[in-house]
Swiss-Prot record:
Function: Glycosidase.
Cofactor note: Binds 1 NAD(+) per subunit. The NAD(+) cannot dissociate.
Enzyme Commission number, as recorded: 3.2.1.-
Positions annotated to bind NAD(+): N70, R71, D92, W141, E142, W143, H144, E161, C162, N190, Y250
Maturation and modification: Predicted to be exported by the Tat system. The position of the signal peptide cleavage has not been experimentally proven.
UniProt keyword NAD present: yes
Cofactor(s) needed for function: NAD(+)
Keyword match NAD: yes
Ligand binding (substrate): Y219, R238, Y250, P251, T252, H253, Y332
Name assigned to this protein: Glycosyl hydrolase family 109 protein
MF-aspect GO terms: hydrolase activity, acting on glycosyl bonds; nucleotide binding
Gene3D superfamilies: Dihydrodipicolinate Reductase, domain 2, NAD(P)-binding Rossmann-like Domain
Region (Disordered): 440-459
């Protein structure tokens, strides 16, 4: 957990064995046994739909944090800053990390949380507590689904860092368990709460872009130094994924906002994906330039193509482009593009062109549309913390929905849908970029209107 939870190489334990065996059987990481592009079956429901289901109201939202490394430790003070939130328990396999987290809570003037660090399964004891309403999971990816499932089975709502799951089977299990236990499972996608993304979303819903046709999202972030750091990702777990799978390993930052623009699972749905990857070159080159002879990294073979590009089509015929590259030198970007019949928005840097306001092929100033900022940004944001304030806005809104007894903005169907390109892109790349169908995690309810990220201000 320390450094996002101190786990050993995920491919030395469960993940590589599972995914490699599946691929060898012609199933791929997505667990698909059907032919290219064949429709995926809808699984029988284990309970009633969780769409639009409200939280029970909480006077205080009591949070248990699993994983207090880089991400978890950075989010801890933001939870404490949100009105009506208390941290009652923290867990990590590193006792030092747990003690630091507990001290941060008490230093902020709050009671000391219960501490769990007795091995990699001690999170189960945290989840059995009766003073935890919401479990926050900030651990290596292979633990997201098991921990979320345990949380729900122990009666806790759960929020998971990206992605919610790494296989289609995992995602279906999250959906099934949420429906069966009546507990919410939320992909904590902070980028959905970024100021620009929320402003564009308001403009879409006010009709400024006309008919929405195309969107693009990405995770383009030079992580080479961090991936090879001996301390940042404890156990160097994140680089290990590049030795096992070739696809878009971090789709939700780009897809979550674009899915909101297109009302995915609220009138439209993702139907199929086609993905392709470049050669894997960047990490090997970085290793050659920076790692000494004899370093254990020289035993690694990187199979994850540096750039993975995916095209997704929706039921309404719209197209989404996703991109992922963490292995090459470049400025940070999530692309965040939207094209409609009335104009276009492109981010990094933010610029806009809308008829009839703009003309002569000259970009307009996006700041001129500040009146369309979401009410969360007008009245709450940016708040403390990094990432431009979107982390705090996300946690504020989460706690608000739990305290007032409202439905969450992001439900288990969104969480599964946004995370699915992880597995589906790997399968498409393995099949020489053949189309692979998206499961309908909503079981046919994707046209049902229900609350989303563009939430109205509570009365």
């Amino acid at each position: 957990m320390a450094g996002d939870e101190s786990r050993s190489n995920p491919f030395s334990r469960r993940t590589l064995l599972r995914t490699s065996a599946a691929a060898g059987a012609g199933l791929g990481v997505a667990g698909l046994s059907t032919g290219y592009g064949a429709a995926q079956p809808v699984r029988p429901a284990k309970g009633e739909s969780m769409m639009g289901v409200a939280f029970e109201a909480h006077e205080t939202v009591r949070v248990g944090i699993i994983g207090v490394g880089n991400r978890g430790a950075s989010m801890l003070p933001l939870f404490l800053a949100v009105p009506g939130v208390a941290i009652t328990a923290v867990c990590d396999v590193s006792a030092d990390a747990v003690n630091r987290a507990a001290r941060a809570v008490t230093d902020a003037g709050h009671p000391e949380p219960a501490k769990y660090s007795a091995g990699e399964d001690d999170f189960e004891n945290l989840l059995r507590r009766d003073d935890v309403d919401f479990a926050y999971v900030a651990t290596p990816w292979e633990w997201h689904t098991p921990m979320a499932l345990s949380a729900m089975r122990n009666g806790k709502h759960v929020g998971v860092e990206c992605p919610a799951g790494t296989t289609v089977d995992e995602l279906w299990e999250l959906v099934d368990t949420s429906e069966k236990t009546r507990r919410h499972c939320i992909q904590l996608e902070n980028c959905s709460y970024s100021q620009n993304e929320m402003r564009v979303l308001r403009m879409v819903h006010d009709g400024l872009f006309g008919q929405v046709l195309f969107g693009a999202g990405a995770y383009l972030h030079d992580l080479r130094e961090l991936l090879f750091s001996k301390t940042y990702y404890a156990g160097q777990w994140r680089r290990a994924w590049h030795t096992g799978l070739n696809g878009d390993l971090y789709p939700t930052h780009g897809l979550g906002p674009v899915a909101a623009y297109m009302d995915i699972n609220r009138g439209d749905r993702l139907v199929r994906i086609t993905s392709m990857s470049t050669p894997a070159a960047g990490l090997a080159q970085y290793r050659e330039q920076h790692m000494p002879a004899g370093d254990p990294t020289w035993n690694e073979r990187y199979v994850k193509g540096d750039a993975t590009i995916s095209l997704i089509q929706t039921e309404a015929g719209r197209v989404v482009q996703l991109a992922h590259d963490v292995s090459n030198p470049r400025p940070y970007s999530r692309l965040n593009q939207l094209q409609g019949t009335n104009g276009v928005f492109e981010d990094y840097p933010a610029r806009i062109y809308l008829e009839p306001t703009h003309s002569n092929d000259e970009w307009g100033d996006f700041a001129e549309f500040a009146d369309y900022d979401h009410w969360l940004w007008k009245e709450v944001g940016p708040g403390p913390g990094g990432h431009g304030g979107m982390d705090y806005i996300m946690l504020y809104r989460l706690a608000q929905t739990m305290r007032l007894g409202l439905p969450p903005d992001i439900d288990v169907y969104d969480s599964a849908t946004w995370s699915a390109p992880f597995a589906l892109s790997v399968e498409s790349v393995r099949r020489n970029s053949a189309p692979v169908d998206f499961p309908d995690f909503t079981r046919g309810r994707w046209q049902t209107p229900h609350p989303g990220v563009d939430s109205p201000k509570p009365a």
